[in-house]
């Protein structure tokens, strides 16, 4: 162990770790839970420190030697080699101060170590005076939240969603001529094609992509420069413009200064809104997964209209059983996302006066949702949707037995007579044709001329 110190005194930290006193105190007083601060946030904080050092250097607020030491240390950390030096949990102060200081301490000590100095000496690089210069945890942490959210959405979620949509589009084309019975209220309705049904799924996902894309607009606004409460105390003139410019280069994202720093620190409406769009996606995915599970139910005593890919045995007691495992896993992910949304909504209400104090749990839940959805969508696409096959015989049988084909006769016979045909066929276990002819409404030839399932599906969804 070695001694580190802060304003409250001496703290013992492991000799082989680069963090300092404030991180050590946080480990002692917030030792519960297994939910570590996401590395996406840690790396976003490191990027901010790198860009802040450059901006401070440009403005003459930080000498070139210290600037270069800080930048070099951040580059090493961003390689992933030092991830073990960021041990703190999400459960800490609601501003994320402990994690901000964890990053400051590791950068400072790594810079000192690389130049032959003594760990914990805070010389020549001080975690507060130099690494945290022109910053506050209150503006740095929300900035990191937005950076991590944008990069995770664009880097993993959107590509996974686009991939799933592409796979569903391919299935819509493959199933374009497979006529099936539609269902409303879980009951038989008029015919459609399986391709049309899949086109509806595709449209849902397309709309989700648009909503998620729109939600990025406000996530591009960064709080950096607001410092403690939004007034910008201790921020040199020109710092905001320069640090944003460097962050744009570092991330490749079109970040801009917050339109109002008091709002940027005291609320997280942009993240609440963005996660809302993820919740809509979760709702759409549950609908799609549930539909496909029902369509393949059976295989002999359910609907059995599609065949699932045979990925693994489905039961430890019933031999030969194949279950929609990917569908169920996806629905559990969506359940978690919907639960996260409730957590984020409540946490979003805790903007007490000038500072929201539930920042860590907001971004933890947000990133968990993004990562789970991205992984689950790819797995669902590759190991489930890609392998779906049509049970053509079952589709045809269900179409031929459906009573709702009588809807095609409504323009000819009227609603009341058609109702009599359907009810007679149901109660007497007759075909629609048999019931219609026995009632004397049409001949067999006339019935066949009007009831043609292939002409009842229209062209929608096949454009």
Swiss-Prot record:
Alphabetized UniProt keyword annotations:
Cytoplasm, Lyase, Tricarboxylic acid cycle
Q: Which InterPro entries match?
A: Fum_hydII, Fumarase/histidase_N, Fumarase_C_C, Fumarate_lyase_CS, Fumarate_lyase_fam, Fumarate_lyase_N, L-Aspartase-like
Which residues bind substrate per the record?
95-97, 126-129, 136-138, 184, 316, 321-323
Localization, UniProt: Cytoplasm
Instruction: Keyword check for Cytoplasm, yes or no.
Output: yes
CDD domains documented for this protein: Fumarase_classII (cd01362)
* Gene3D superfamilies, per database record: Fumarase/aspartase (C-terminal domain) (1.10.40.30), Fumarase/aspartase (Central domain) (1.20.200.10), Fumarase/aspartase (N-terminal domain) (1.10.275.10)
EC id: 4.2.1.2
SUPFAM superfamilies attached to this UniProt entry: L-aspartase-like
Q: Which residues form the active site?
A: 185, 315
Q: What is its main location?
A: cytoplasm
- Which ranges does the record mark as transmembrane? none
Q: Which GO terms describe its biological process?
A: fumarate metabolic process; malate metabolic process; tricarboxylic acid cycle
Q: Does the keyword Ion transport apply?
A: no
GO molecular function annotations of the record: fumarate hydratase activity
Q: Which PROSITE patterns match?
A: FUMARATE_LYASES (PS00163)
Pathways per UniProt: Carbohydrate metabolism; tricarboxylic acid cycle; (S)-malate from fumarate: step 1/1
At the top of the EC hierarchy, this enzyme's class is: lyase
As for what it does, the entry says: Involved in the TCA cycle. Catalyzes the stereospecific interconversion of fumarate to L-malate.
Under the subunit heading, UniProt states: Homotetramer.
Q: Which NCBIfam families match?
A: fumC_II
Any further remark recorded for this protein: There are 2 substrate-binding sites: the catalytic A site, and the non-catalytic B site that may play a role in the transfer of substrate or product between the active site and the solvent. Alternatively, the B site may bind allosteric effectors.
The record's comment on protein family reads:
Belongs to the class-II fumarase/aspartase family. Fumarase subfamily.
Q: What is this protein called?
A: Fumarate hydratase class II
What organism does the UniProt record list as the source? Chlamydia trachomatis serovar D (strain ATCC VR-885 / DSM 19411 / UW-3/Cx)
Upper lineage: Bacteria, Pseudomonadati, Chlamydiota, Chlamydiia, Chlamydiales
